[in-house]
């Protein structure tokens, strides 16, 4: 049976923790919600969007209509694909494998930035890897590793001594 001191894996509950951590930095004036993520993550400066196929079935790409903003990343409207379908963007995501568990956040970002967007930033909601990009933004903006930032600014002040990443 579960007790007050039972230790469990919290899995997706890291998403709200990550959101809180990023918003702490916003409250401190470290960034604006409408800042392009490329300001902090330059690898995302020239994102491409799938533009269909030509008469021969070759996939075409075009420049995204605008930069991805931190607001887009916070609300899953950045246009990031995932491995859930067979569009060209999904296939490229699967090949780049940004979410592999052996990658650190910096490598995840480098790989994700090579994947064309599924749609233009802000165009629609699509669930995916955005919380990982939020964690990478936390590292870049705070200058601390993500796990260290969250421990110092969220878990320790709340007395959550047994909560951590591994």
Short names for language-model regions:
Residues 19-20, 132, 148-149:
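A generic alpha-helix surface/boundary motif
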Residues 23-28, 132-140:
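Short glycine/serine- and small hydrophobic-enriched flexible loop segments
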Residues 22, 150, 159:
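Active-site-flanking alpha-helical
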Residues 1-126:
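Active-site-proximal loop and beta-strand segments within enzyme catalytic domains
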